[in-house]
Amino acid sequence: MKRIFLPFFFLISLSISAQTRNKNNKAIFLEDISWTKAKEVLTVDAVVVIPLGAAAKEHGPHLPLATDYIQAEHYKNMVALERKVIIAPTFSYGLYPAFIKYPGSTTTFFTTSRNMLLDIIRTISAFGPKRFYVINIGVSTLPALQQAASILKQEGIVLYYSDYARPNYENAEKGIKEREAGGHADEIESSNVLFMRPELVDMSKAVDDTTGYTRPGPLTPVPMAPGKLSPSGIIGFATFAKAEKGKRNTINFTKELVKDIDSVATCALPVPKDNSIAYKSFLGNYTGAKGESIEIGFDNNRMYYIMNKGRDLRKFFPLFPDSEDHFTSMYVDFLFVRDEKGDVIRLWCSFRGDNFWLTKNR
């Protein structure tokens, strides 16, 4: 089904081009190793770090669209020097709806962003790891991260992430920035990129713009259009940026990331939710008008399906809940329908773009 495959083929930047790693790294970069080596290092005790930063999102006329991505890449390399973790490839697309009126800026839908995280974390977790940390370079990404963390908790998996609004990250900027107003392509963010990738910054185009600072909503460069007017796409005082400020902020921010990762490494794992009772009403055989058949079964605390009495792929593609009566897997979407008594009586199936109804056999 096309919608399900999008996160895998279009929404993730694997960053697999040849790179020179620091010889002092303690971390292992997943993209650099073979599957046999991955089998050795993806243990239950491993912490997997996932950098998340947009590679196509406006950051004013002076910064590149890849500003978030540049920061995510830099921070993952800083973390690699400090802790023996597994670092996954960087996610370069996500939920950034506030910037889509600026050419070159991209966003996914909320469900795509959330499911992208769930898909990748569940895939890696199947090999052992139950502790995940996202280096989150963004704010609009938080709702998807929060919901993904809540869902994964019920599966016995820890997901934690950096959040600029937490006091420890706010404190990282104290004593560095000269102007309080800001939040996007501002003094701090511009300073970060000046330090990390100075050749990509054109400070002659930097301006101080707080027109979009006063009220919530998406930004727009067009006067009289819906949303917050921000002619530059900047919220804050970009002209105050200096590479030295970026260096200091980066060091402080990395310290907070490492503290977070240490807490993930040592926290108690959640107890997975027992689904045996909740899923009981879905189990059984379903038949379609054209002879289609689907068996819904239960194994290892998860539901699985067998379509048209074909191969049993329960170990490969279990069903995951999207809502109370909606489940998804690699190729399918299932929506279960109940009668007035609350009993499951029908099943809507979307399989690789084909949609059909089935009735539960009594």
Per-range role (PLM):
Residues 269-362:
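Peripheral terminal and inter-domain segments
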Residues 6, 50, 88, 317-320:
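Hydrophobic alpha-helix-in-membranes signature
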Residues 19-97, 103-111, 115-132, 137-270:
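Extended, histidine- and acidic-residue-enriched regions that form the cofactor-binding/catalytic faces
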Residues 5-6, 259, 348:
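Intrinsically disordered, low-complexity segments enriched in glycine/proline and serine/threonine
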